[in-house]
């Protein structure tokens, strides 16, 4: 059985908790709660968490589905180097960001989600995972003539693959001396010149 990559789960959890923090902060600020400044803090912290967590990290095995527009944010996250690559730093950062938002009822759900994401990042860091960006693969140009193995022998329209089966010996003998209607021969020689 394969090994679980915890960073992938932490990334999804942290991104969702950032959105929950933003929503709770908007409710607290727009509702003019008595401690509305914690709501304003939650909006700022949620936006920061969403920007940090939007680019997915590359998986060790298999392919990673890139988020829409991720390549632009990946360049920004790469600029901070080990601060964004190391999951110990992310675990501590998310835990510290979640504490002030826990003092307000509207943002306590985002706080709990971000604390859970922090715990998952800590588990990923203990298991030796780190964030690596998804780099675009260089496109390989197909070489001209390298993809064509052998040109078709029958002129179009060609029959389907089932009908193109090799004839048995009896059918070949009948076709050789039989009535016309067999394969047509092109009277003009065709040459394939690849430049």
Curated annotation (Swiss-Prot):
Keywords: Cell membrane, Chronic granulomatous disease, Disease variant, Electron transport, Heme, Iron, Isopeptide bond, Membrane, Metal-binding, NADP, Oxidoreductase, Phosphoprotein, Transmembrane, Transmembrane helix, Transport, Ubl conjugation
Membrane topology recorded in Swiss-Prot or TrEMBL: Multi-pass membrane protein
Glycyl lysine isopeptide (Lys-Gly) (interchain with G-Cter in ubiquitin) crosslink residues: 149
GO CC term, one of those recorded: secretory granule
A GO molecular-function annotation: heme binding
Topology, Cytoplasmic side: 2-7, 54-69, 81-86, 127-195
Compartment list: Cell membrane
Coiled coil: none
Residues passing through the membrane, by range: 8-30, 36-53, 87-104, 106-126
Modified residues (Phosphoserine): 168
Any matching Pfam family: Cytochrom_B558a
Modified residues (Phosphothreonine): 147
Post-translational modification: Phosphorylation at Thr-147 enhances NADPH oxidase activity by promoting NCF1/p47-phox binding.
Entry's disease: Granulomatous disease, chronic, autosomal recessive, 4: A form of chronic granulomatous disease, a primary immunodeficiency characterized by severe recurrent bacterial and fungal infections, along with manifestations of chronic granulomatous inflammation. It results from an impaired ability of phagocytes to mount a burst of reactive oxygen species in response to pathogens.
Similarity field: Belongs to the p22phox family.
Protein's name according to its UniProt entry: Cytochrome b-245 light chain
Species this chain originates from: Homo sapiens
High-level lineage: Eukaryota, Metazoa, Chordata, Craniata, Vertebrata
Gene (UniProt): CYBA
